[in-house]
């Protein structure tokens, strides 16, 4: 049974500008240490911005699917890829529901779609 759905779209050049202006301060506020560490495999600023934009969209989409951001911060939500490259989302707070995640990017935009099932 579907509990909620959420979607978000992020303008990648905006994330790139934020990274240039605020750097680690921005990253440490939104992303987990592991997400930041995994981003280091990308050598170019453009690829890192794309990586973080998709994860930001996923976090926002999850909050929308949940119906509220109360009691949860962005760092409670982590986005990874399995060995086949499929994205998945974990939540550090007690959250038992099954979460489905789809990420995409094209040109200047990154999108995420989340379905929460109970």
UniProtKB/Swiss-Prot annotation:
NCBIfam families to which the protein is assigned, alphabetical: acpS, pantethn_trn, PRK14659.1
Entry keyword annotation includes Cell membrane: no
Family, similarity comment: Belongs to the P-Pant transferase superfamily. AcpS family.
Gene that this polypeptide is encoded by: acpS
Organism: Wolbachia sp. subsp. Drosophila simulans (strain wRi)
Domain of life: Bacteria
Annotated Pfam families: ACPS
The protein's role, per its UniProt record: Transfers the 4'-phosphopantetheine moiety from coenzyme A to a Ser of acyl-carrier-protein.
Gene Ontology MF term list: holo-[acyl-carrier-protein] synthase activity; magnesium ion binding
Protein's name according to its UniProt entry: Holo-[acyl-carrier-protein] synthase
Organismal lineage: Bacteria, Pseudomonadati, Pseudomonadota, Alphaproteobacteria, Rickettsiales
A GO CC term attached to the entry: cytoplasm
Reaction catalysis annotation: apo-[ACP] + CoA = holo-[ACP] + adenosine 3',5'-bisphosphate + H(+)
Residue positions binding Mg(2+): 8, 60
């Amino acid at each position: 049974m579907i509990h909620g759905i959420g979607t978000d779209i992020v303008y990648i050049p905006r994330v790139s500008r934020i990274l240039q202006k605020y750097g680690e301060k921005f990253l440490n506020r939104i992303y987990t240490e592991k997400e930041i560490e995994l981003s280091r495999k990308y050598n170019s600023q453009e690829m890192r911005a794309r990586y973080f934009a998709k994860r930001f969209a996923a976090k926002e989409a999850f909050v929308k699917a949940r119906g509220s951001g109360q009691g949860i911060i962005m760092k409670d939500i982590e986005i990874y890829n399995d060995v086949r490259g499929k994205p998945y989302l974990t939540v550090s707070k007690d959250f038992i529901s099954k979460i489905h995640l789809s990420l995409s990017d094209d040109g200047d935009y990154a999108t995420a779609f989340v379905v929460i099932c109970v």
